[in-house]
């Protein structure tokens, strides 16, 4: 447990009916007695008290709750004071708590103490922040599942299988005189393949969680007057970009945020891509290329009446952008032709003006980025995906060592590193730098 005692306001800034001050640490109970005039508190019971300044002047009345460690969120003694939600009153309670021996908590320090005292793992700690910041009902439900341990259980079960395989492999290395040749034993290969399959399944589910948490950066690109601004207006359901017949109207980056089946979609409209001598337009085009290189997905909007635009610009995009960025070609202005809306894997025919084909576009976007709502069972972060990818790469390397070289020692080392990488997800093995980065992004009172 920590030596010092921390205090912070646990409710959002501003005025409200109720404001909560949270205290955690060895002096929490003594500080509460200083604030409530030495009125005894029973664990897990709300006690109505007058709250005093150091000079015994009453500053408010409210409820005081006492959670005795280790049976509390942080694992330490916790006091929660529910006072009136006046910023002045709450600030005075903070000052009096500090005068009585507490210090102001760092962002996320309550959750950090819960993690360090083994009350929650790192996934659950992150889920607290994700639940607070959830942008949709689905994201909130998935964050709650992570907080309840759904994601952690999957990682822990995977680790248990990996530990068993490590024990089997390392025991066979340590006792080579045994009659069984583990390198040619199909059991090792089967176990390893099963673990890789389970890891891929969890990775797919985690990817859905990342999409729900972080959303998707969707950049709209194309030649001038292809209908990019009309498209962003239609996707947003309101006029966010100026639309005229004058080529080059959009000269700067335009951003809009919407929900696409609970996926936060960060839409970015860009200047028309062409050669220009206009200094302002050239700067807009430069910024457009910067956004394109950071995109999760690109919509290449093409005027269907000028299809020759498509090939040259599509080739330029493919040569310039990383291969991992998918490009959806959107043939716009079908309302000026006899064509109807349709789509395939990376192509959509629509009218941004009338909205015909917009549903098909949304469907293709979800398919291209791999969104499968039936698979999303918990919220996840990019660091989780990176760890899962790294663990898979190590397991595949180990599989190669076993299959091609019969190198048991090298297989054992790859299994050890994969196990350690997976443990970083839950925080069993985690650097102090990563912990600092994660918890510093929390609210002060969390």
Swiss-Prot record:
The entry's GTP-binding residues are 225-230, 244-250, 269-272
Please name the Gene3D superfamilies in this protein's record.
P-loop containing nucleotide triphosphate hydrolases (3.40.50.300), Probable tRNA modification gtpase trme, domain 1 (3.30.1360.120), tRNA modification GTPase MnmE domain 2 (1.20.120.430)
Q: Which UniProt keywords apply?
A: Cytoplasm, GTP-binding, Hydrolase, Magnesium, Metal-binding, Nucleotide-binding, Potassium, tRNA processing
Its predominant location is cytoplasm
Record-listed Mg(2+) binding positions: 229, 250
Cofactor(s) for this UniProt protein: K(+)
A Gene Ontology molecular-function term? Answer: GTPase activity
Q: Where do the annotations place K(+) binding? A: 225, 244, 246, 249
Residue span, TrmE-type G domain: 215-370
List its EC numbers: 3.6.-.-
The record's cofactor note says: Binds 1 potassium ion per subunit.
Alphabetical GO CC annotations of the entry are:
cytosol
Matches recorded under Pfam families: MMR_HSR1 (PF01926), MnmE_helical (PF12631), TrmE_N (PF10396)
Entry binding sites for (6S)-5-formyl-5,6,7,8-tetrahydrofolate: 22, 80, 119, 446
Sequence similarity:
Belongs to the TRAFAC class TrmE-Era-EngA-EngB-Septin-like GTPase superfamily. TrmE GTPase family.
> In UniProt terms, what function does this protein have?
Exhibits a very high intrinsic GTPase hydrolysis rate. Involved in the addition of a carboxymethylaminomethyl (cmnm) group at the wobble position (U34) of certain tRNAs, forming tRNA-cmnm(5)s(2)U34.
User: Subunit structure, per the record?
Assistant: Homodimer. Heterotetramer of two MnmE and two MnmG subunits.
Name of the featured protein = tRNA modification GTPase MnmE
Provenance organism: Legionella pneumophila (strain Paris)
Give me the gene this protein comes from.
Answer: mnmE
């Amino acid at each position: 447990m920590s030596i010092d005692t921390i205090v912070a306001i646990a409710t959002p800034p501003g005025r409200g009916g109720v404001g909560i001050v949270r205290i955690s640490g060895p002096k929490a109970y003594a500080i509460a007695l200083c604030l409530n005039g030495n009125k005894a508190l029973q664990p897990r019971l709300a006690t109505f008290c007058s709250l005093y300044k150091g000079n015994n002047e009453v500053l408010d009345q409210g409820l005081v709750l006492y959670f005795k460690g280790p049976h509390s969120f942080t694992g330490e003694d916790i006091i929660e004071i529910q006072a009136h939600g006046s910023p002045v009153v709450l600030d005075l309670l903070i000052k009096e708590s500090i005068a009585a021996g507490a210090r102001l908590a760092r962002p996320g320090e309550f959750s950090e103490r819960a993690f360090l005292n083994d009350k929650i793992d790192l996934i659950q700690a992150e889920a607290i922040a994700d639940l607070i910041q959830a942008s949709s009902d689905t994201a909130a439900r998935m964050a709650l599942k992570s907080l309840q341990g759904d994601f952690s259980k999957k990682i822990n079960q995977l680790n248990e299988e990996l530990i068993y395989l490590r024990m089997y492999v390392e025991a066979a290395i340590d006792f080579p005189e045994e009659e069984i040749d583990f390198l040619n034993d199909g059991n090792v290969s089967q176990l390893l393949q099963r673990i890789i399959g389970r890891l891929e399944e969890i990775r797919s589910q985690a990817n859905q969680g990342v999409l729900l948490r972080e959303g998707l950066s969707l950049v709209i690109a194309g030649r001038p007057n292809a209908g990019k601004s009309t498209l962003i207006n239609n996707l947003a359901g309101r006029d966010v970009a100026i639309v005229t017949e004058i080529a080059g109207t959009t000269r700067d980056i335009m951003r809009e945020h919407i929900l696409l089946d609970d996926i936060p979609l960060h839409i970015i409209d860009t200047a028309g891509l062409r050669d220009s001598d206009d200094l302002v337009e050239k700067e807009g085009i430069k910024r457009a290329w910067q956004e394109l290189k950071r995109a999760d997905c690109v919509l290449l909007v093409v005027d269907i009446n000028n299809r020759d635009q498509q090939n040259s610009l599509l080739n330029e995009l493919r040569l310039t952008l990383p291969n991992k960025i998918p490009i959806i070609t959107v043939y716009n202005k079908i309302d000026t032709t006899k064509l109807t809306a349709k789509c395939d894997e990376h192509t959509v025919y629509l009218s941004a003006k009338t909205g015909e084909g917009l549903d098909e576009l949304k469907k293709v976007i979800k398919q291209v980025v791999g969104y499968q709502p039936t698979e999303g069972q918990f919220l996840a972060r990019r660091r989780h995906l990176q760890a899962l990818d790294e663990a898979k790469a190590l397991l595949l390397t180990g599989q190669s060592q076993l299959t091609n070289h019969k190198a048991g020692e090298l297989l054992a080392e790859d299994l050890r590193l994969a196990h350690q990488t997976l443990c970083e997800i839950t925080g069993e093995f985690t650097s102090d730098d990563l912990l600092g980065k994660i918890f510093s992004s929390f609210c002060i009172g969390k």
